[in-house]
Amino acid sequence: VNTHAHRDHVGGNRYFERALIGEAELPVYLDGRKKNGFCEADIIREGDIIDLGGKTVEAISFPGHTPGGICLLDRADRIMFTGDSVLGRTVWLFMPNSVPVSEMKKSLEHLNTWRSEFDWLLTGHSRKIDDPRYIDELIGACDAILTGGPAERFGQVEIWGDKLDCCYYTGEDGMQSTLVFRVLCPPVFWLASPSLT
């Protein structure tokens, strides 16, 4: 089960006969499949229950880091697997196909509707998050960015041949994460921070 189609998450697919991936991830996955010999993939949609052999998880749609990202809810052990959708240090929204901050906020609010069903989040690259209220901190960061809060220029990042201008926002004291997001024109949030103009 792939949370999204980035190479660092689908590389092991060559060892399986079939994989599952979100529908909006399929074009990226198929391109990688041609180059890397990945297995065939079936579409997974929100609400699908996946039997992993003695363990079941439910797919939850999460456009953010990628447009077709999914999280997986393990109700029995009260774990939300987030892949790269929610990380413990930095959430990357600057990738070539990442969604805008406004869409990320909607996805976080959507994920929050399951909050009573998990006690911690298991991420794709960082430590586990043992307080689901962390999602509220990320929603607050999205709100601050969308209302012109103080963002700092991150600089230009080159990823997979694309050069992207990025900014980051780190919240108030106690905020555990940083949102790194693409600069979209017009960069209205720069108005709050003259150092970014």
Predicted regions and their residues:
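Residue-level signal for well-ordered alpha-helical segments
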Residues: 27-29, 34-39, 62, 81-88, ...
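Histidine-centered active-site/metal-ligand motif
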Residues: 4-9, 65, 125, 183
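Short C-terminal domain-edge/linker segments immediately following a structured domain
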Residues: 3-5, 9, 30-35, 49-52, ...
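Generic low-polarity alpha-helical segments
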Residues: 19-20, 43, 96-99, 191
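Accessory terminal helices/loops
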Residues: 109-197
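Active-site HxH/HxHxD metal-binding segment of metal-dependent hydrolases
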Residues: 1-51, 144
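Metallo-beta-lactamase
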Residues: 58-63, 67-146
